[in-house]
Amino acid sequence: MGGKKFQAMPQLPSTVLDRVFEQARQQPEAIALRRCDGTSALRYRELVAEVGGLAADLRAQSVSRGSRVLVISDNGPETYLSVLACAKLGAIAVMADGNLPIAAIERFCQITDPAAALVAPGSKMASSAVPEALHSIPVIAVDIAAVTRESEHSLDAASLAGNADQGSEDPLAMIFTSGTTGEPKAVLLANRTFFAVPDILQKEGLNWVTWVVGETTYSPLPATHIGGLWWILTCLMHGGLCVTGGENTTSLLEILTTNAVATTCLVPTLLSKLVSELKSANATVPSLRLVGYGGSRAIAADVRFIEATGVRTAQVYGLSETGCTALCLPTDDGSIVKIEAGAVGRPYPGVDVYLAATDGIGPTAPGAGPSASFGTLWIKSPANMLGYWNNPERTAEVLIDGWVNTGDLLERREDGFFYIKGRSSEMIICGGVNIAPDEVDRIAEGVSGVREAACYEIPDEEFGALVGLAVVASAELDESAARALKHTIAARFRRESEPMARPSTIVIVTDIPRTQSGKVMRASLAAAATADKARVVVRG
């Protein structure tokens, strides 16, 4: 192993709850959770007591092992308290954004049949009528009572007891896939999902992503998405101070500085926002040590700027179905060049990957060949999902012999890194040629004056489809400058892409529609761009 020495890891608890409670044993007076505005603060010993109290309330409502509990989230400490209280009983936390339309909440209930609902105080439902789908089950408002916080909690064996019947394979939570289209699917995640990769990093002595006891982390990511839930639970299991929810300003710079944040995880749009604020204020965040980012393709210039301030970065790639992160691209020599080329990283040790040249034909299919250099990515990770709840047909399509079909198209290059090209379902087929959307986006974003770019499909009788391109300019442009930028973009495509991949239409827009996790909503983009009568057509 190249002379590298590995330290034997102590036997760690096999559930998220037991790992958090272990931190409470070691540092009971340390703050575990609080909001950005300082409210809802919980010390680790107080968190243990609150978990026990809320679990008792659920037990009184006949919630037990295997029950589903709808957690109406506001991303604050009460949301994570709810998840841990469910874990105390072996119940499954079904994560739902508190600002979702009632119809979406009711659809989630139809899919998961919850036995109870926990409502965080900052969610829309906390101050409005309860949806009809919840009328038949107990609905509990989660509130961290001041009298409870001010009392002295002793950490005895009973309060620190987790659930002896639970292990790493038992389910902890469900997250509904955001996606850009299609029916919502409830991704069932085991306890191991939230610590498998951190355990690998510790065992292998890798510093790609690191956690330090007592450090402050901040997550603006929703607890209803894998990135937010994974990040905060992981930091709790490592004894961090987790700041989440309760934002009293839109300024990321102010939040990070005021709370002396050491680590954070952002989607690329928020990373761009932070860079813009740092440049405008000519400032740095002295406490900041690490910025993780993922969810969609990042802008290399943003990563370069952050790293120039002395802050490490780590791009993480994964899906809800793969347990957040399966590939990683940390700060390293040449990492910026790789990001510019569309790299998303390389797999962690213990994570297997396979590129299928034929869509739908996975690594264990009869006659499957070796991994291709380009194709649909399959991942076998110890963090992979258990399956889609109550959806065996879809589970059988996506999860085969422990391998998850990501649906993403990637290229593996000689440097061992993987480069994203788009989703197989979003491929644009022009004149029989497969066009990878992310490659089109990447070429456009390499043009000076382009802040963001995303392509979309334009139906065409002759070719089947043409490529349309929407661009967000780096600065406000008049008509002449806009036309010049479009011609510059077209010229770059003539130099760098095959003819069928060259945009037939280029439109400058103010923003690109994205999901909460930062993925481009290409169907919405196509509809909006097509309706824009002011667009300029550029043939090239």
From Swiss-Prot:
One of its GO terms (molecular function) is medium-chain fatty acid-CoA ligase activity. It is an enzyme of class 6 (ligase). CDD domains: FADD10. Disruption phenotype: Cells lacking this gene are shown to be highly attenuated in a mouse tuberculosis model. Keywords: ATP-binding, Cytoplasm, Fatty acid metabolism, Ligase, Lipid metabolism, Magnesium, Metal-binding, Nucleotide-binding. Mg(2+) binds at residues 177, 321. Pathway: Lipid metabolism; fatty acid metabolism. One of its GO terms (cellular component) is plasma membrane. Its main location: cytoplasm. Dodecanoyl-AMP binds at residues 315-316, 408. ATP binds at residues 226, 316, 320, 408. Pfam families: AMP-binding (PF00501), AMP-binding_C (PF13193). It catalyses: a medium-chain fatty acid + holo-[ACP] + ATP = a medium-chain fatty acyl-[ACP] + AMP + diphosphate; a medium-chain fatty acid + ATP + H(+) = a medium-chain fatty acyl-AMP + diphosphate; a medium-chain fatty acyl-AMP + holo-[ACP] = a medium-chain fatty acyl-[ACP] + AMP + H(+); a long-chain fatty acid + holo-[ACP] + ATP = a long-chain fatty acyl-[ACP] + AMP + diphosphate. GO terms for biological process: fatty acid metabolic process. Induction: Repressed by CRP. Coiled coil: none annotated. Its EC number is 6.2.1.20, 6.2.1.47. It is found in: Cytoplasm. Its cofactor is Mg(2+). Acyl:acyl-carrier protein ligase involved in the biosynthesis of a unique class of isonitrile lipopeptides (INLPs) that seem to function as virulence factors in M.tuberculosis and to play a role in metal acquisition. Catalyzes the activation of medium/long-chain fatty acids as acyl-adenylates (acyl-AMP), which are then transferred to the phosphopantetheine arm of the acyl-carrier protein (ACP) Rv0100. Can use octanoate (C8), decanoate (C10), dodecanoate (C12), tetradecanoate (C14) and hexadecanoate (C16), but not hexanoate (C6) in vitro. Belongs to the ATP-dependent AMP-binding enzyme family. Retains a single open conformational state for both the apo- and ligand-bound forms. Homodimer. This is Medium/long-chain-fatty-acid--[acyl-carrier-protein] ligase FadD10. It comes from Mycobacterium tuberculosis (strain ATCC 25618 / H37Rv).
